[in-house]
């Protein structure tokens, strides 16, 4: 088989890591597609996407259409390159059927769930939030639907009880190259398989979703916190202030019939709150406009004992 010509489309860190790994392979990366540069921070300094940084470091042409409708010339430029494959991971821009039809072997999407479970924008967070014990990487032949294409390859990954969205994201960034390379090696003979099972949807995360519902079980709250770490962050409301939570542990003791959301006790080692079944101890909290701190450090400058017995929500 001749050396494949590949165009890569992606934007954030996870895409950048896969691109780095792809450069180490025998394949020829003709061009890279990524979202337009953004002005960020107080100084509104223009920043390149992580994928663009990697592409420029490897002297690869970069295309950054606002959309393919607004920049149809990019489609023509891609057609002229005659790629064998286009690899897509977290690109963030809708691609038309005309784009999907360009490469000889089609467009391959790297999706970080075991499809058809968790189609959509936030598969990592939704898998943790739901308490799933496994997830994985799917190499999918893209079609016009939302993550509905046939499956070419999968890699299953366990979700540990300590995994957050960040740690699981990092695992995907490291491991996604393996099933991709396996797929590319067999691209001429691999047989696509239709997705099997009932689909579920990983809807986009909103900032407001971080609010903790203490009427749920301690395990459900653990899943909630880990799903929304680092963004948007899980929090509770105390004195009309949103208090973000950091490190925590579940205390395997009952709540002595105290109502869910009751602040049971405050120690130098933690801030104990009743859930529907157990006690959850927060070892770190972040008050508005402050850093995330250990409880012992917060107690050095703040009187929290007055909240013992207070019911949240």
UniProtKB/Swiss-Prot annotation:
GO terms for cellular component: cytosol. The keyword Hydrolase does not apply. It catalyses: L-methionyl-tRNA(fMet) + (6R)-10-formyltetrahydrofolate = N-formyl-L-methionyl-tRNA(fMet) + (6S)-5,6,7,8-tetrahydrofolate + H(+). It comes from Francisella tularensis subsp. mediasiatica (strain FSC147). The gene is fmt. Attaches a formyl group to the free amino group of methionyl-tRNA(fMet). The formyl group appears to play a dual role in the initiator identity of N-formylmethionyl-tRNA by promoting its recognition by IF2 and preventing the misappropriation of this tRNA by the elongation apparatus. This is Methionyl-tRNA formyltransferase. Its EC number is 2.1.2.9. Belongs to the Fmt family. One of its GO terms (molecular function) is methionyl-tRNA formyltransferase activity. Keywords: Protein biosynthesis, Transferase. InterPro entries: Fmt, Formyl_trans_C, Formyl_transf_N, Formyl_transf_N_sf, Formyl_transferase-like_C_sf, GART_AS, Met-tRNA-FMT_C, Met-tRNA-FMT_N. HAMAP family: Formyl_trans. The keyword Protein biosynthesis applies. (6S)-5,6,7,8-tetrahydrofolate binds at residues 113-116. PROSITE patterns: GART.
């Amino acid at each position: 088989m001749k050396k494949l010509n590949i165009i890569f489309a992606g934007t954030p860190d996870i895409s950048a890591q896969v691109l780095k790994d792809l450069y180490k392979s025998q394949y020829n990366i003709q061009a890279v597609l990524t979202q337009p540069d953004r002005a960020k921070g107080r100084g509104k300094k223009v920043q390149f996407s992580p994928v663009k940084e990697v592409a420029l470091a490897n002297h690869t042409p970069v295309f950054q259409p606002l959309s393919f409708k607004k920049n149809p010339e990019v489609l023509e430029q891609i057609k002229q390159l005659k790629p064998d494959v286009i690899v897509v991971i977290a690109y963030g821009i809708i691609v038309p059927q005309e784009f999907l039809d360009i490469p000889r072997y089609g467009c391959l999407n790297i999706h970080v769930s075991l499809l058809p479970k968790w189609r959509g924008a936030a598969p990592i967070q939704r898998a943790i939030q739901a308490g799933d014990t496994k997830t994985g990487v799917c190499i999918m032949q893209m079609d016009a639907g939302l993550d509905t294409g046939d499956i070419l390859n999968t890699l299953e990954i366990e979700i540990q009880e300590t995994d957050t969205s960040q740690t699981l994201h990092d695992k995907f960034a490291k491991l996604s190259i393996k099933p991709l390379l396996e797929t590319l090696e067999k691209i001429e003979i691999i047989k696509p398989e239709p997705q099997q099972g009932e689909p579920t949807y990983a809807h986009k995360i909103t900032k407001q979703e971080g609010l903790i519902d203490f009427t749920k079980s301690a395990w459900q709250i653990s899943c909630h916190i880990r799903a929304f770490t680092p963004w948007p962050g899980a929090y509770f409301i105390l004195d009309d202030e949103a208090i973000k939570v950091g490190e925590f542990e579940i205390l395997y003791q009952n709540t002595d019939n105290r109502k869910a959301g009751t602040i049971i006790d405050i120690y130098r080692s933690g801030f104990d709150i009743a859930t529907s079944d157990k006690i959850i101890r927060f070892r770190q909290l972040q008050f508005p406009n402050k850093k995330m701190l250990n409880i012992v450090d917060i107690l050095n400058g703040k009187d929290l004992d007055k909240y013992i017995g207070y019911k949240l929500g």
